[in-house]
Amino acid sequence: MTDAATNMRLKLPITCFILEIILIILFGTLVQYDYETDAKEWHNTSHQDYENDFYFRYPSFQDVHVMIFVGFGFLMTFLQRYGFGSVGFNFLIAAFSLQWATLMQGFFHGMHGGKIHIGVESMINADFCTGSVLISFGAVLGKTSPIQLLTMAIFEVTLFAVNEFILLSLLGTKDAGGSMTIHTFGAYFGLMVTRILYRPNLDKSKHRNSSVYHSDLFAMIGTVYLWMFWPSFNSAITAHGDDQHRTALNTYYSLAACTLATYGMSAITSHDGKLDMVHIQNAALAGGVAVGTAGEMMLTPFGSMIVGFMAGIISVLGFKFLSPILEDKLKIQDTCGIHNLHGMPGVLGAIVGAVTAALATTDVYGQGMADVFPAVADGSVNATKQGGIQALSLAITLGIAVLGGLIVGFVLKLPVFGTPPDTLCFEDSVYWEVPGSESPEEGELTSVKPEETEHLNS
């Protein structure tokens, strides 16, 4: 039997049931199919079935969905005793967040006649929002209870929708791949939460805050899925035609260049020239993050490769040198290193987007300017001002993420959430039935000490 403080027998079912009942009521009251999903509305107009947006967007949605549930979930399985928590809580948070995001994003973007209209594009956007929450999850991985994670998701999804509305609807910011709205927001929100939840005695669990051979292999499954599908992620909601094609291509080459930079930097920063699997699992993905904002712009293939190359270098240096400083000096215990994979590359992507937007001309974009920068095309703003809007959007995103993360962190610090003790962080058996657990004498795959077993069974 687990410790009374971490026992989820009543807390988790009550929380899950109440949240889902509320969601069902809200969906029943506010949500309905959009015209491309509704049987009556679709057949009231003259068109062919293959013109339905489903056939254009669903392949991208499938890829994004795999990234959310398989990619993010398995990327975090590197911890030797927290594989269930990584994949399992990722599953739980994502299932809740996509429903709550549908409501929050619909409230700001999709209200028609007092109803939220949903279709395949709203599914993609909900997954994007969920991705931001899962990024924040990476910062607090192994140190929080499922109740805390669900509570964090409630607040973060809401703030994500507010930030997204300000940037995309009010300011006219371009951020199709979410360098700002998804990665920067999720990273700095999560970093502030984990700062407030700082554990001065986390060293008591440091023997579990590491990987073993097979756990790193599982994490590489997540890396490979994310790497393969990132072009779909960045291009999923861009305009059909050349915009979507260009975004996928730019992401494709950015990731490739980033990967070579990652391998090179990993060897350089190691005193014996050996590769660090932490770098390969994470930094090789930074190119997808960094090209998210500018991916749909005329960045050019070599430009996207430069961005990816820079992102790989920055990310590896962050893992090697910056993460220890953040923990020692700023007391930011970032379990997955989200600052290095999502935070700094996200900021880089926002800067690249601002510069690329400021340099946009009709000679380069022609009539395509209307798709990429509609406000510039219709004369509402010039390219320089669009670049300024992009830069302002980064500042707004950072402000909302930092302030929101600090506030939510204090909420999560309340003693009602059943957090694991310092001695049992990064340990599945606190919240999960773990079959076939090995004793320390039987092998090195387990790091549970005898006194910790007594604590769990008390």
UniProtKB/Swiss-Prot annotation:
- Is rRNA-binding one of the keywords UniProt gives this record? no
Disulfide bond sites: none
SUPFAM superfamilies hit by this protein: Ammonium transporter (SSF111352)
The family annotation for this protein states: Belongs to the ammonium transporter (TC 2.A.49) family. Rh subfamily.
Annotated Basic and acidic residues bias: 449-458
* Name used for this protein in its record: Ammonium transporter Rh type B
Report the locations given in the UniProt record.
Apicolateral cell membrane; Cytoplasmic vesicle membrane
Q: Which organism is it from?
A: Takifugu rubripes (Japanese pufferfish)
Q: How does it sit in the membrane?
A: Multi-pass membrane protein
